[in-house]
Design a protein with these regions (language model features):
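Bacterial N-terminal signal peptides that target proteins for export
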Residues: 1-9
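Bacterial N-terminal signal peptides
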Residues: 9-18
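Primary mode marks residue(s) on the alpha4-beta5-alpha5 output face of response regulator receiver
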Residues: 26-191
């Protein structure tokens, strides 16, 4: 008799678990879409790198690539935003470009906050619309203090996910120190 009642209870519990999982996945997809749309609206003018430099962004650390991972691209960083200890979806600390056909193309953004500034008033790592930031310790390749970061590939698809650090579809192939970025910037206006 007890087994007769056990099966319906198990089926009800499994159904509730499945519905909860679907609801959570749906909420996460909505948050992801909202964040990507926010990034696109906030950065559409920065497709022109001259607009980015006029807004306080500057070239930082060349083109970042990994041997197996793809690349992170060419970062233009606004130091005032990095140092403010705040996260604002409409004001990313870094804009990510890639040189394609001799032009700088906006491919994504990176939100960055110095860990010491964040940790002074928060107990958990930063999140933005449901996305948890990654921690990068020091020392690091950028020669900056430990920081939290979140990439958003809003302008170029990333088959590994829109919030992963590395994008196999981004390349540093056309990048050479100095002149390639300067020449690409001169030809990037209006795309």
């Amino acid at each position: 008799m007890k087994r007769k009642f056990l099966l319906p209870v198990v089926l009800i519990l499994l159904s509730l678990f499945a519905l909860t999982t679907v609801a959570l996945a749906s909420t996460n997809n909505v948050q992801q879409g909202t964040l990507v749309n926010t990034v696109r609206n906030a950065t559409k003018n920065f497709k022109d790198v001259d607009a980015a430099t006029s807004a306080g962004y500057g070239l930082f650390h060349g083109c970042v690539s990994g041997p197996q991972e793809g690349a992170m691209g060419i970062h233009y960083v606004n130091g005032d935003l990095v140092g403010d200890g705040e996260i604002d979806a409409s004001h990313p600390e870094a804009l990510i470009y890639e040189i394609r056909d001799g032009r700088l193309r906006l491919v994504g953004v990176e939100y960055v906050v110095i860990a010491e500034a964040w940790d002074a008033s928060h107990e958990m790592p930063p999140t933005l619309m449901g996305q948890v930031f990654h921690y990068a310790g020091a020392p690091n390749r950028y020669k900056i203090p430990a920081f939290y970061e979140l990439h958003v590939w809003a302008w170029k698809e990333n088959p590994n996910g829109m919030f992963t650090d590395w994008n196999p579809k981004v390349s540093c192939e056309e990048y050479t120190e100095g002149t390639a970025v300067e020449n690409a910037a001169e030809h990037s206006s209006g795309h």
